[in-house]
């Protein structure tokens, strides 16, 4: 669960490096006091469950830009079961859909296309095996996406590693192939997150269930005392 969660998180770094989709990262972000006031973030945060993405949209509305500083990436060590990882990624996906739709759409379209083509490739192989119809072998070429996905993961790992603070690069290098081999699973999980976040507006965090009605309206649905 922890490895999959880490791989899933690492997938956000290319979006951080792209000026069109870059956004504040809750683990390490800074803003000038005067910009904070101009964006009215104190009031916005009183009604939101996301601090980083509301900050992102607030700054963009002022016509200002966000700067991604790789040296400020904060690394945390935490265990996570598969269930906890799924809950976390579902929550983050829904938050991005409500607060930063461009990021959600970019992620949704990319992973949906990749995974649907892979599924089509698998189905083509099964149908060819059952019927012997050679035409389905053409569809099976979609499975070439898997090795391409692994090659991309190798390239992305090297790029991401270079962005991290020097003192932890050795630890990350030790897990190189763990990241690469869990990349396809992280992509499938992202598709699951997309479907889940498209079907609901509720998240549960520390025993409290919230409904995200809009970027400026969040209500408490229930809480476990």
Show which residues each predicted segment covers.
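Membrane-embedded multi-pass helical conduit in multi-pass membrane proteins
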Residues: 107-201
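Long helical/loop segments within the catalytic core of UDP-sugar-dependent glycosyltransferases
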Residues: 1-43, 86, 90-93, 179-192, ...
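Short, isolated positions in well-ordered beta-strands
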Residues: 210-211
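Catalytic donor/gating beta->alpha subdomain of glycosyltransferases that bind UDP-sugars
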Residues: 1-8, 37, 42-104
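Short, surface-exposed, low-complexity cationic segments
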Residues: 217-225
């Amino acid at each position: 669960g922890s490895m999959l969660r880490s791989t899933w998180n690492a997938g956000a770094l290319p979006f951080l490096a792209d000026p069109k989709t870059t956004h504040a990262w809750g683990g390490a972000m800074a803003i000038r006091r005067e910009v904070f006031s101009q964006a009215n973030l104190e009031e916005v945060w009183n009604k939101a469950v996301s601090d980083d993405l509301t900050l992102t949209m607030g700054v963009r509305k002022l016509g200002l830009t966000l700067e991604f500083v790789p040296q400020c990436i904060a690394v945390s060590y935490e265990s996570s079961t598969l269930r906890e990882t799924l809950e976390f990624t579902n929550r983050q996906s829904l938050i991005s859909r409500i607060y930063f739709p461009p990021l959600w759409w970019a992620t949704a379209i990319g992973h949906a296309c990749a995974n649907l083509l892979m599924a089509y490739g698998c189905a083509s192989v099964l149908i060819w095996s059952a019927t012997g119809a050679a035409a389905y072998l053409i569809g099976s070429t979609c499975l070439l996406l898997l090795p391409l996905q692994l090659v991309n993961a190798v390239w992305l790992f090297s790029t991401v590693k270079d962005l991290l603070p020097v003192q932890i690069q050795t630890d990350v290098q030790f897990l190189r192939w763990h990241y690469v081999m869990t990349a396809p699973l992280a992509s499938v999980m992202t598709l699951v997150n997309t479907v889940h976040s498209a079907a609901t507006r509720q998240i549960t965090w520390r025993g409290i269930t919230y409904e995200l009605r809009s970027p400026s309206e969040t209500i408490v649905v229930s809480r476990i005392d």
